Amino acid sequence: MTETTSGRPLRADARRNYQRILGAAESVFAEQGADASLEEIARRAGVGSATLHRRFPSRRALLLAVFRDGIEALCDQARALTEKAEPGPALTSWLRALTAYTVSHRGLALLLLPAGVGLEPANQDDTCHAMLNAAGGQLLKQAHVAGAVRPDVSLADLLTLVNAISLATEADGNPRTADRLLVMALNGVHPLP
């Protein structure tokens, strides 16, 4: 994200503006959620509204940039778990990490929705939702093969569950509450004896 659309590196001042916008956006989204004023973000970053909109043409694009590193880390964790852990516990561990991250980062829950739901449409390949589908899909597939999860449970079901818990607990922001709810819900996705 530090290159222009032509692939050339950003000028030093443009790179500084980009970083200031991301820093301000992270703070404002943490305080006010995904519906925070873009004008307030530009003001806190010390840039004009046009500068913000030139670099981030939509709210979704700005949210994606703010949360991308964390989502990539969660995707890396999913890939590592597919290689090292038992399928059922691996899936549970990843969903718990995803829930904790989502609850502690206001605004992220909306970004986890498929493009066009909750925020303006975006390129599906460019969304956190698509990244998580790719990473979590393998964990779920392994859990299905191992019989650790009911066959009718989809990744969309699990991401919707994480999203609903995150949105429901966003006001108190307590990851323990969200984790407790997730564990209760996950007990329902295990196969019946």
Regions found by a protein language model. Give the residues of each.
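Basic, helix-initiating cap at the start of DNA-binding domains
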Residues: M1-R43, A61-L64
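C-terminal peripheral helix-coil segments that are non-catalytic and often amphipathic
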Residues: M1-T5, A134, Q138-A146, A168-P193
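Amphipathic alpha-helical segments that line or abut small-molecule/effector binding pockets
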Residues: G23, E72, G88-V103, D179-V183, ...
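Short hydrophobic/aromatic patch on the recognition helix
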Residues: G46-F56
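Hydrophobic alpha-helical connector segments
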Residues: A65, R79-S104, P121-Q124
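Short, basic, alpha-helical segments at the C-terminal edge of helix-turn-helix-like DNA-binding modules
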Residues: R68-C75
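Short linear capping/connector segments at secondary-structure termini
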Residues: L110-E120
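All-alpha amphipathic helical-bundle segments outside canonical DNA-binding/catalytic cores
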Residues: Q124-C128, V145-T160, A171-T177
